Amino acid sequence: MPFDRQPLLSGEKGMPATSLWLVGGAVIAAVCVIVNTSYNGTQLSVTARPIQAAVSQVSMARFAESGVSRGSGNRVSQAVPLMAASVGAESESRRWVASAILFPLSGLFAAVALKMAMMKPKVAAVLPFTSEKDMKVWNPVNNKKFETFSYLPPLSDAQIAKQVDMIIAKGLSPCLEFAAPENSFIANDNTVRFSGTAAGYYDNRYWTMWKLPMFGCTDASQVLREISECRRAYPQCYVRLAAFDSVKQVQVISFVVQRPSGSSSSSWGMAAMTGEKDMKVWNPVNNKKFETFSYLPPLSDAQIAKQVDMIIAKGLSPCLEFAAPENSFIANDNTVRFSGTAAGYYDNRYWTMWKLPMFGCTDASQVLREISECRRAYPQCYVRLAAFDSVKQVQVISFVVQRPSGSSSSWGMAAMTGEKDMKVWNPVNNKKFETFSYLPPLSDAQIAKQVDMIIAKGLSPCLEFAAPENSFIANDNTVRFSGTAAGYYDNHYWTMWKLPMFGCTDASQVLREISECRRAYPQCYVRLAAFDSVKQVQVISFVVQRPSGSSSSSWGMAAMTGEKDMKVWNPVNNKKFETFSYLPPLSDAQIAKQVDMIIAKGLSPCLEFAAPENSFIANDNTVRFSGTAAGYYDNRYWTMWKLPMFGCTDASQVLREISECRRAYPQCYVRLAAFDSVKQVQVISFVVQRPSGSSSSWGMAAMTGEKDMKVWNPVNNKKFETFSYLPPLSDAQIAKQVDMIIAKGLSPCLEFAAPENSFIANDNTVRFSGTAAGYYDNRYWTMWKLPMFGCTDASQVLREISECRRAYPQCYVRLAAFDSVKQVQVISFVVQRPSGSSSSSSWGMAAMTGEKEMKVWNPVNNKKFETFSYLPPLSDAQIAKQVDMIIAKGLSPCLEFAAPENSFIANDNTVRFSGTAAGYYDNRYWTMWKLPMFGCTDASQVLREISECRRAYPQCYVRLAFDSVKQVQVISFVVQRPSGSSSSSWGMAAMTGEKDMKVWNPVNNKKFETFSYLPPLSDAQIAKQVDMIIAKGLSPCLEFAAPENSFIANDNTVRFSGTAAGYYDNRYWTMWKLPMFGCTDASQVLREISECRRAYPQCYVRLAAFDSVKQVQVISFVVQRPSGSSSSSWGMAAMTGEKEMKVWNPVNNKKFETFSYLPPLSDAQIAKQVDMIIAKGLSPCLEFAAPENSFIANDNTVRFSGTAAGYYDNRYWTMWKLPMFGCTDASQVLREISECRRAYPQCYVRLAAFDSVKQVQVISFVVQRPSSGGRSW
């Protein structure tokens, strides 16, 4: 049989003639073995003999690796009994026949092995089995662990070629990477810690790329040649082959094709290749590491041109960047640390751009000229060429085309003669601007050329400036991006020179503005940005003035004569506003011109003001953005002057408001914002008044027409957000606003709060992450009754306001516009301030006579519930009216309850939302009373449940509501407060009709989430729930846990970030077998419950409804509590029909996630699961790990953020070969499991179902536990 690898390439020499007799002898010996086997009538067993044969082959492979390859003679003799063990004889009398044949056969094999070891002493001879896959893996025991594919053994060319063919067939690009040993493992300085992304099979470390990804590669031999060249160049480095997805910009799969010589594995001895590529790379050993492409050697023009042609062909724009050595490496001050994005092949450092990206470049010679010019200008700098994607605003690929002179290799490229018309300032020992900052003083012609390109792309030119002390990156004027790609825009806040030049069609307009700004601010930096008014981001920017007296050449541009009609205040030594704040006092004509532009864009003018001490950026009035681009809106909360002017069609209306606001607040800043009512964000804003006594006086004529609203004085006044300074409003004023709210399809909603709870504080506020700053107040106040869904008349709202004012004269009351689709407050304003406060005139509204039928409890000095908690005891009629509304909205009524000590917001029963809007649902986990009432059509059903729950828990809070589609609480309100509390007693008549479930007592009882207090259920009760689960297309799924592991704790719980609070339990329990995909009968589930109960009488058992599409638990409830607990004993009759799987005992047993307690499985059991995996279009995938690496730990686990808890294990184990893409037969998987078990008897082995589309493990279960621990196999 073939013992060594196939010939490497066509250029490799063939086998010498002197060894032909050895091969011939081996063939003759093999024929003898076949004759001997036939003669003895050997019969191979289906279950035993192939495993014995495979074991002997593994032993022979080990012998070939460790013995023959090292020339060990002692190992040769040891191979004889190993081979003899693979052949069995039937009778003792015929043993001499086998011995007579095997003796010369052993000699022949020894001679062959000796000859091969002498010819190729460095080859790792991997034995390719005929019935098995062609890859082995290194031993992970006591071995520092690589991710994913790292333990694969030295692979032959045939083995690698087979994998490359699969990579190419999938439309991926092969990509070689390498790294010195000290940089090859996971560490913070060369690893992306993923947040908000699934655990796909790509390695999240930055290694160095060997040349560019092989885009367009169609032949495995091309890859083999590259591997050979890389091996010769870096015998002391790891080398891996990755499959690179050029669309998603991620590595999809990768595996190691070289381990450093001298390591525990065999050395690499591949024959040198004759055909070599035209690029080399620098030596990374003991060399400070660049990311991705940095070790590429000095490239010739032909080499660069070839890459540029590929870049242009892909529709990308070449883009040159450079950096002084001290700024060229990864550091916090010049790097974006990505969160929530895949690891694409772009470099996440900010270097300085050499001129603008070469948009529209069609010829590599243009790029070569730029490279030559940049090299001459900066011989002491690194220079890299990037491929810039102008649509996604990211660098896609980049590689270094110059390393500073004096480094390891000299540059000998001929100087270019044709040069572009721009130079750049010297970055050496120069405080670094981002992206475009080193560009030299530009002539008008140069600027005009760039402006033409900006206009042609549909962008708006936009001038900005800043005093030197504010122009660099610093925390107080910079957005640190999280969850966004590194586009070419500058993430500092400079001051805008007037508004973006929307609709600009002529570069001369921009040149005039630049001239004016230069004259006004000779000591400031000025930059020209291209502003995208759709995405609200700067796309590109470059400096058009540096302060006079700096190191650059003087500016000699001719002064412009035509000037615009706006000036700006001097920012020098002036506390800086964001974006628009230095604009000068504007005339009515100037403001009107801007307002016309705002209205034309479909935006709503919106006035805001603030006292000086509250007008600047500070934590208590500012949203720190996370996960959002830096649009041109000011991320501070000022106070709104009346509501946004929705439907405004005339600038004169705005001018009247500005005049009125100025007269009311001469000591305040006032700004005019353009408010986008769809996205709920400020888009642009500029200051129209600065406090009197400042650097410039205001001379605008007073306006005569005034609106009918005033606002309270914000000076020395604790500040509300957004709408809080509005004055006492008349009924007519409120009615006008309510009409606007109703016309927009929103629902009026009253809220109130005691003064001590009404301001921003951590315990009553949502701190937004990943969401824009909309005009809603992110505090939780108490709702006055439910949102007024379906309200069509402002008089209904006025009656409610009147009633709420009478009930709570010492509380703040606000009216919010509630969007029932997005579940957020859109706008809100205060309609009452507590009596006796510093404010304004008392409230004199006539008392309303018609009142609603609900009151609320007093929140004063009362521990606050969220949202709906102060509602008073409700009558049946009141509750029924609300239930009818809930049912009409397609929601499911759902009762919950909690003991008083567990009912308030606390870390152990509350989800702290990140990245989600503040909807009207309560983000606490209470205990569900039975399941949500799916399909409920009658309020009387709910009333009966409320009555039963009240009788069972007179000392508990009880609340009602649930949305079964979004798996969130949409609305909820308390229908019982514990007896003995300050509210009136409950006098509802007891209901007679009761449901068939009770719940355990939660008082002084360690709390389960969601469904845990349900009582022991009868078979009929469980079957009824299972029928509902199946009818919804969900899969029943049993889980269990020992008592000490069953509660919420950090080691078995997912803390959700960025996801809604659905009704599933966010703890990891152990799954009893796999989810019951395709289950159609409740009796199947009852049999499983019975079996699990008998196996684990001391464990909790719960039944979950598993959604196989979303990969989440949707609902779950406990069907067993440990014996000896406070609940009644379980008396269910034992079931006779059992499934074919058992599980290990979890009691006092370190816990695996999800599937880990499954028992040793037979081949038939595994094959049945593999058939299900294949039928779902998934790929079987084996993984293994040494015991010390197999459990959850920071170095081998992804901590999920922003993703649901699907049934896949979020640990990195080592893959046994590649995922079995295209596997169609369970027997293939069984052979791999058998081989892996023999190779690693002391390791855990698991079988995963790998989704090659989503790049995630979907399901996995253990098929081997180490022989030294736990139950034997």
Swiss-Prot record:
Top-level taxon in the UniProt lineage: Eukaryota
The organelle targeting sequence, given as a residue range: 1-134
Description of post-translational modifications: Eight small subunits are processed from a large polyprotein. All start with the same sequence but there is more heterogeneity at the C-terminus.
GO biological process: photorespiration; reductive pentose-phosphate cycle
Keywords: Calvin cycle, Carbon dioxide fixation, Chloroplast, Photorespiration, Photosynthesis, Plastid, Repeat, Transit peptide
Matches recorded under InterPro entries: RuBisCO_ssu, RuBisCO_ssu_dom, RuBisCO_ssu_sf
GO molecular function terms noted in the UniProt entry: ribulose-bisphosphate carboxylase activity
Name of the protein described by the UniProt record: Ribulose bisphosphate carboxylase small subunit, chloroplastic
The species this protein was found in: Euglena gracilis
